[in-house]
């Protein structure tokens, strides 16, 4: 079956497509893709993974056409980011 594995850091993004056996798991696909060697900062024991934006466990089965995503840790408080965006939008309205 054909699946993809994707990851993005602050500077680059990578989406790898590959053929996997039908009974493969998310973790097997990630390891097989070689993405862990290209991004050594990825720590699967800490970082969350998903399929098409939905969180899944590493032992979740993959299906034909799945896009497996490795998520980076949040580095900013989402509430703070939202407040800054709202404040910025309000400033733009004054023009």
Swiss-Prot record:
Pfam families: Ub-RnfH (PF03658). InterPro entries: Mopterin_synth/thiamin_S_b, RnfH, RnfH_sf. It comes from the Bacteria. Signal peptide: none annotated. HAMAP family: UPF0125_RnfH. Belongs to the UPF0125 (RnfH) family. This is Protein RnfH. The lineage of its organism: Bacteria, Pseudomonadati, Pseudomonadota, Gammaproteobacteria, Methylococcales. The gene is rnfH.
């Amino acid at each position: 079956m054909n699946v993809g594995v994707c990851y993005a850091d602050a500077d680059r993004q990578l989406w790898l497509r590959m053929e996997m056996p039908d009974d493969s798991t998310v973790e097997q696909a990630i390891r097989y893709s070689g993405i862990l060697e290209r991004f050594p900062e990825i720590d699967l024991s800490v970082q969350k993974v998903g399929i098409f934006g939905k969180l899944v466990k590493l032992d979740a089965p993959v299906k034909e056409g799945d896009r497996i995503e490795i998520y980076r840790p949040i580095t900013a408080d989402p509430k703070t980011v939202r407040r800054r965006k709202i404040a910025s939008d309000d400033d733009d309205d004054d023009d």
